[in-house]
């Protein structure tokens, strides 16, 4: 199923060069948009710095788990197994879970679970960005769909745990 879904999403050899460039932009640079917007917003609205702290703590947790998974269980990338077409230069590191998916979905879930009403338009924008980043990683041949889904799941769990245990921060530091 993972391979079948990958082949449905993955770009073919004759794919439009313009579409490939768009996907490369999404895969490598679009992830910076929510980070930049969040940074700018927090400079002008210091009251939301707590969101950035929650995101950073969630990222620390989920990236640690991701590091452990990637070093304990090697999952070859599609191009390593000669499946589909690869349009993005990448090391032959383990692909599970996708660090790009982990990073971008941690931002999205942090907003949705903590500040959806205050950041409604930003929540929607970051979701569109997350979907484009994740799609592009599969489209360009560097990730399996399962890599993306596991990254999303780990991000959600991380953000949920930080939200649940946030009160401990106030007990210790306030």
Q: What function would you assign to each model-found segment?
A:
Residues 29, 33, 55-67, 152, ...:
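Alpha-helical transmembrane spans of integral membrane proteins, capturing the lipid-embedded, hydrophobic core
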Residues 39-47, 141:
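Perimembrane helix-loop-helix junctions
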Residues 1-32, 66-93:
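N-terminal transmembrane-helix/juxtamembrane module of multi-pass inner/ER membrane proteins
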Residues 30-42:
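N-terminal signal-anchor/start-transfer transmembrane helix
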Residues 46-115, 173:
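Membrane-interface loops
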Residues 17, 47, 64-68, 156-161:
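Transmembrane alpha-helix boundary/anchor motif
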Residues 16-18, 47-52, 117-122:
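Membrane-helix interface segments
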Residues 88-174:
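Membrane-embedded catalytic cores of phosphoryl/pyrophosphoryl-handling enzymes
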């Amino acid at each position: 199923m993972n391979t079948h879904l990958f082949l449905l999403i993955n770009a073919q050899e004759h794919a439009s060069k313009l579409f490939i460039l768009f996907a490369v932009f999404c895969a490598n640079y679009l992830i910076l948009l929510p980070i930049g917007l969040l940074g700018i917003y927090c400079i002008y609205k210091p009251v939301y710095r707590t969101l950035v702290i929650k995101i950073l703590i969630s990222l620390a947790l989920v990236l640690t788990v991701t590091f452990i998974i990637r070093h304990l269980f090697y999952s070859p990338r599609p191009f390593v197994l000669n499946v589909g077409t690869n349009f993005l230069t990448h090391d032959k590191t383990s692909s599970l879970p996708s660090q790009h998916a982990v990073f971008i979905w941690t931002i999205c879930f942090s907003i949705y679970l903590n500040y959806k009403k205050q950041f409604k338009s930003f929540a929607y924008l970051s979701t569109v960005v997350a979907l484009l980043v994740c799609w592009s990683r599969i489209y360009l041949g560097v990730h399996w769909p399962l890599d993306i889904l596991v990254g999303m799941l780990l991000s959600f769990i991380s953000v949920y745990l930080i939200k649940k245990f946030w009160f401990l921060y106030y007990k210790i530091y306030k």
